[in-house]
Amino acid sequence: MAADRTAAGTAVRRRQCRGGVRRQRTHVLSSATAGGPHPRNLIGMTVSIPTTPNTRLQGKRCLITAAGAGIGRESALACARAGAHVIATDIDAAALQALAAESDAITTQLLDVTDAAAITALVAAHGPFDVLFNCAGYVHQGSILDCDEPAWRRSFSINVDAMYYTCKAVLPGMLERGRGSIINMSSVASSIKGVPNRFVYGVTKAAVIGLSKAIAADYVAQGVRCNAICPGTIKTPSLGQRVQALGGDEQAVWKSFTDRQPMGRLGDPREIAQLVVYLASDESSFTTGQTHIIDGGWSN
């Protein structure tokens, strides 16, 4: 997951490609490729993820944060393939340019998710939205004794306060039209399953679940749904960066991740993106206030 600060409100030129989203082959995911440099494959499993254009989100406008890489990027592409027009935000201008080149259904904009005024301005310029996917997040590693006050404040600013700002900004437009789907990124780590050295991260992700359930309860009668996604360990660029930052034997770290997974592999961002499309679509119209665990059986 991408996170934290940018020069708010600076637009990135949208690149066009012929025919909307570029057609891609079905992506086949094997346990060896998804789990890092660890060859163990407990069940010989492959996952076929379709990438052909469809109409599941036809006519919907989606706002996605942290769309420059990982889960956010794959979700933006998946929503665009499903017929949505996507406003994709991030703090990385180069990543947004690369994303915009993939689809003419994606408009990109730099955004600091901790800047409430910038979020309000973005929604005023590009809204109203049918779908909000809050993907931005920050992972602090350590126990309560390792978490000083600045780390505590930063974690809440990015992981919780930013969702408060975005939800509050998009809700009036959703309520006015009597429809909307808000999808908030939580985590299995600590909020669902106790995980060592994820103290403040887990606290914030538990708060995301509470935020999501409260919004769902308040606006269910007005046609607005709100759900939380709780992934397990997903092989994203940010996870790779955290592994590198630990130093030491990187292969041993990757092995520790896959060893705790009953499926013998890590998740792929494209698998999470498929859940995002489902929750964004009318297929999930009877689903709200739920925590959707997608962790390969880790928390079972």
Swiss-Prot record:
NAD(+) binds at residues 63-90, 112, 205, 234-238. Belongs to the short-chain dehydrogenases/reductases (SDR) family. It is an enzyme of class 1 (oxidoreductase). This is 2-keto-3-deoxy-L-fuconate dehydrogenase. Plays a role in the catabolism of L-fucose. Catalyzes the NAD(+)-dependent oxidation of 2-keo-3-deoxy-L-fuconate to 2,4-diketo-3-deoxy-L-fuconate. Keywords: NAD, Oxidoreductase, Phosphoprotein. Its EC number is 1.1.1.-. GO terms for molecular function: oxidoreductase activity. The active site is at Y201. PROSITE patterns: ADH_SHORT. Substrate binds at R198, R242, R260. It comes from the Bacteria. It holds the Pfam family adh_short_C2.
